[in-house]
């Protein structure tokens, strides 16, 4: 913290408008934020910022911002003191648990801007009162990709784009979604890297590609396995890496034989000649190939295996943990700083853990889509209270009418958010939340290298 020549107070922090978490300067006058810009000495963004980050102060001072606790009455919303709201909510939680059991209460943590690190507190709370029912948006976003990578090589990491000879972007549009990643991609391009973009949509980054591959939505896995087949059948894969660091190669090689260029072309609509061209470029660039799968690959019924198939190309080309390839390594270990006990809770039958065991085993959390069925049917047991923080399932979940009916069936619905959302309108209590610029938290950057 410092003061500049204009007597402005300057504080350094991380922007949490997205996962990049750029370093920023906050300029304050009389305790009020008057400007935000990039922190030049921060190694991730090096002083650069996108429009979203520059406008983050609008979250704090927006005229529609929730500032006081609200209680729903027969006459509409009533402002009440925070202490009263917390006391009344606590009494109602106890009543629900006494009537229906400890598991009848749940927490749902959303991903509204700047709320990612609220997970640990939410988990700690719900576990402390005896319920395994922690929900988040991970059911629908990102974790499918994470699981796909973990099934391949144990973790998800970013590519070393500045040193890559080939950058392969699969279902991602970093100019709009990951600005710092795009900076590294531009460095790689300046250093001579070719770029292949695979996406059903002609995105901003696709327009900059050397090769743009437009395929049918959801067929990414077939294309990846077809490329794997070409590399293996032509003996253009990293035999040393495969023999030293992998298991199951023979079974994998046998499985991908059916993914001939002709078969893959029929599945994906990608021309046979283009499939061969991509394989040739990959073989020439290996091991300096930096892959990146976006969330687009996981938004299908075969989403996990789409990403899993692409991760196999990392291994075949020997790209893992090599300059210009995919970075591996331990981050600063935020998981070691969690405030909840990460222990198996299967014996408490968390919602969705039986039907979706892989998801539960990876995340130790419940399935949001199934929560609505549980509220409406009381199966496998009653779910009668929910506390949501920065989540808006009425807007973000499928089947809006079903979501509204399910939430209306609860004995207690509490929403904590920055604004009055569609879900908050249905709540019994609405609590104002602090924005990421108004609270202290531990964060790592998107490359898992820096703790701030």
Regions found by a protein language model. Name each.
Residues 1-234, 258, 271, 389, ...:
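N-terminal export/assembly segments and adjacent metallocofactor-ligating motifs
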Residues 90-93, 228, 279, 310-318:
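Short, amphipathic alpha-helical segments that act as regulatory/interfacial helices
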Residues 101-104, 237-242, 288-290, 321-328:
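Flexible, glycine/charged-enriched surface loops at secondary-structure junctions
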Residues 106-114, 267-270, 294-301, 333-334, ...:
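Conserved short loop/turn motifs at secondary-structure junctions
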Residues 119-186, 191-197, 221-225, 311-426, ...:
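Extended redox/cofactor-interaction regions of prokaryotic respiratory oxidoreductases
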Residues 203-208, 254-260, 286-293, 349-351, ...:
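Short acidic (Asp/Glu) and glycine-rich catalytic loops that position anionic groups and cofactors
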Residues 244-247, 281, 296, 326-337:
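A glycine-rich phosphate-binding loop feature that marks nucleotide/adenosyl-phosphate handling sites
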């Amino acid at each position: 913290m410092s003061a500049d020549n204009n007597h402005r107070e300057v504080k350094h922090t991380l922007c949490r408008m997205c996962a990049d978490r750029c370093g920023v300067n906050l300029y304050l006058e009389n305790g009020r934020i008057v400007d935000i810009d990039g922190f030049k000495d921060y190694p991730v963004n090096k002083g650069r910022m996108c429009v979203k980050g520059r406008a983050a102060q609008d979250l704090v001072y927006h005229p529609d911002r929730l500032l006081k606790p609200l209680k729903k009455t027969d006459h509409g919303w009533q402002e009440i003191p925070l202490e009263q709201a917390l006391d009344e909510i606590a009494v109602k939680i106890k009543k629900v648990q006494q009537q229906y059991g400890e598991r009848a209460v749940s927490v749902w943590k959303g991903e509204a801007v700047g709320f990612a690190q609220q997970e640990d507190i939410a988990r700690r709370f719900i576990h402390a009162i005896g319920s395994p029912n922690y929900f988040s948006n991970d059911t629908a976003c990102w974790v499918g990709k994470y699981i796909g990578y973990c099934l391949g090589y144990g973790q998800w990491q970013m590519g070393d784009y500045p040193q890559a000879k080939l950058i392969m972007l699969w279902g991602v549009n970093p100019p709009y979604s990951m600005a710092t990643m795009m900076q590294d991609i531009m460095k790689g391009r300046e250093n001579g890297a070719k770029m292949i973009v695979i996406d059903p949509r002609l995105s901003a980054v696709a327009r900059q590609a050397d090769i743009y591959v437009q395929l049918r939505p959801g067929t990414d896995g077939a294309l990846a396995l077809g490329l794997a087949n070409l590399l293996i059948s032509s003996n253009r894969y990293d035999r040393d890496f495969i023999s030293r660091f992998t298991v199951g190669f023979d079974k994998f090689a046998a499985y991908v034989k059916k993914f001939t260029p002709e078969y893959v072309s029929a599945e994906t609509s990608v021309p046979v000649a283009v499939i061969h061209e991509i394989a040739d470029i990959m073989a020439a660039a290996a091991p300096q190939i930096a892959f990146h799968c976006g969330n687009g690959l996981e938004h299908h019924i075969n989403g996990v295996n789409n990403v899993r198939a692409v991760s196999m190309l990392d291994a075949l080309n020997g790209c893992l943990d090599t300059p210009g390839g995919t970075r591996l390594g331990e981050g600063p270990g935020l998981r070691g700083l969690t405030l909840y006990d990460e222990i198996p809770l299967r014996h408490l039958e968390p919602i969705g853990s039986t039907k979706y065991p892989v998801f539960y085993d990876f995340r130790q959390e419940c399935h949001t889509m199934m929560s609505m069925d549980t509220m409406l049917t009381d199966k496998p047991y009653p779910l009668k209270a929910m506390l949501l923080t920065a989540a808006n399932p009425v807007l973000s979940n499928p089947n809006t009418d079903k979501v509204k009916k399910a939430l209306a069936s609860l004995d207690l619905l509490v929403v904590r958010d920055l604004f009055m959302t569609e879900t908050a309108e249905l709540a019994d209590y609405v609590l104002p939340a602090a924005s990421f610029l108004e609270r202290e938290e531990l964060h790592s950057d998107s490359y898992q290298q820096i703790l701030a």
